[in-house]
Amino acid sequence: MIPQPKNTSEPISKTRLRLWLKLLKASSKIEMELRRRFRVEFATTLPRFDVMAALSRKPNGLKMSNLSDLLRVSNGNVTGIVDRLTEDGHALRVAMPGDRRAQVARLTPEGQAVFLKLAAAHEGWLDELLQGLNSGDAATLYNLLGKTEGEIDAQ
């Protein structure tokens, strides 16, 4: 049974405010649990997973600046994570063809194999954490959040 808003006669702005707070709380709880599981089960971090995920989608690599833009973090954060991935043999950096000043980061075959293990665990954890949503609920929430994102992007 889905709980209803506390007061259905209140202004929609109040309901939207509570919705925003609920989204933040749920997102924070999920993120904290993912961080904990990555640390405990793989001795790694969520930001490291995020960098590996971005690099896994670009087999030819990504410029460091594009990687930081994609992940919406500073160049310094990305550089530190890529440095550690490189030290561990999971990534490498090469000069960008045509611009030796720019570097492209990409996963090594070992890094790709590690990422696939992390990604499988990540998907399983999220499936477990969101098991309270049936298929229809998950699709509806996904579509509504997509609609909201599109409306914000259009502003």
Regions found by a protein language model. Name each.
Residues 1-42:
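N-terminal leader segment of winged-helix/HTH proteins
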Residues 27, 59, 115, 149-152:
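A structural signal for well-ordered alpha-helices, especially hydrophobic packing surfaces
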Residues 28, 32-74:
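N-terminal helix-turn-helix DNA-binding core of bacterial DNA-binding proteins
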Residues 139-155:
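Exposed, interaction-prone assembly regions rather than primary DNA-binding/catalytic cores
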